[in-house]
């Protein structure tokens, strides 16, 4: 039997990269997956690429009204959620302290922190007992990387959320964990010069960038019963970058 046979999963921000890879794997492993994205054209393309048992819902995680539409769609379609993977997020790799504005701060925190909280809160009534909530973090929160203070702070907030929510939801058997990718070969990295990509890879103990499939496999572990005794952790998938 597949690892997610008959389960219902929601993955936000799943039109590309790591979350798209996770959605594809979850469907392969037997789940019906609801994916979200802000742009309908990208969402439609992702649904077509995944194929099979998937539903696309246009939703901006930074907009509470859009989150209500997501809840309505899941309630009407299946009435429950077994796995919630909060992957939607935004940020920039180059925003030093002197460049941060009120608008840029509010925008990043609005999606990455407020959006994550209200995504979980609004879908919580549909969460099955024994379900899994996965928050998409990042290894940058503990590294002190210049130009990423705001983005890193949002990921540190998710780490705090996971610990608190794991304690709050333990009575329902709901597990809450953070999945923190390191440098991964997605569109953001693909747009950098080759020499920079090589420098980044050289910093990683395993001497390569992560692939979306690497992240998807760990998301599957956290989503499935394989991690039934795991909650409140921050699981780094970074080739050892933040560990060694």
Q: Where are the model-predicted features located?
A:
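Conserved glycine-rich cofactor-binding loop
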Residues: 8, 15-16
């Amino acid at each position: 039997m597949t690892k997610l046979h008959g389960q219902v999963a929601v993955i936000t921000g799943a039109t590309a990269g790591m979350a798209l890879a996770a959605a594809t794997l979850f469907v392969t492993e037997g789940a019906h997956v609801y994916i979200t994205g802000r742009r309908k054209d990208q969402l439609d393309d992702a649904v077509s690429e995944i194929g099979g048992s998937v539903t696309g819902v246009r939703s901006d995680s930074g907009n509470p009204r859009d989150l209500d539409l997501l809840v309505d769609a899941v309630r009407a379609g299946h009435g429950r959620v077994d796995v919630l993977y909060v992957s939607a997020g935004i940020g920039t790799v180059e925003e030093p302290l002197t460049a941060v504005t009120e608008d840029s701060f509010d925008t990043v925190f609005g999606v990455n922190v407020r959006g994550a909280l209200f995504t979980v809160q609004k879908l919580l009534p549909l969460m099955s007992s024994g379900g899994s909530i996965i928050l998409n973090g990042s290894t940058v929160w503990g590294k002190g990387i210049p130009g990423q203070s705001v983005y890193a702070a949002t990921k540190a907030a998710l780490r705090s959320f996971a610990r608190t929510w794991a304690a709050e939801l333990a009575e329902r058997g709901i597990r809450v964990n953070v999945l923190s990718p390191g440098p991964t070969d997605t569109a953001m990295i693909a747009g950098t010069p080759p020499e920079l990509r090589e420098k980044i890879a050289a910093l990683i103990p395993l001497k390569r960038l992560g692939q979306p499939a690497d992240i998807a496999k760990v998301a599957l572990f956290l989503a499935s019963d394989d991690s039934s005794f795991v909650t409140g952790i921050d699981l780094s998938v970074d080739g050892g970058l933040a560990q060694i």
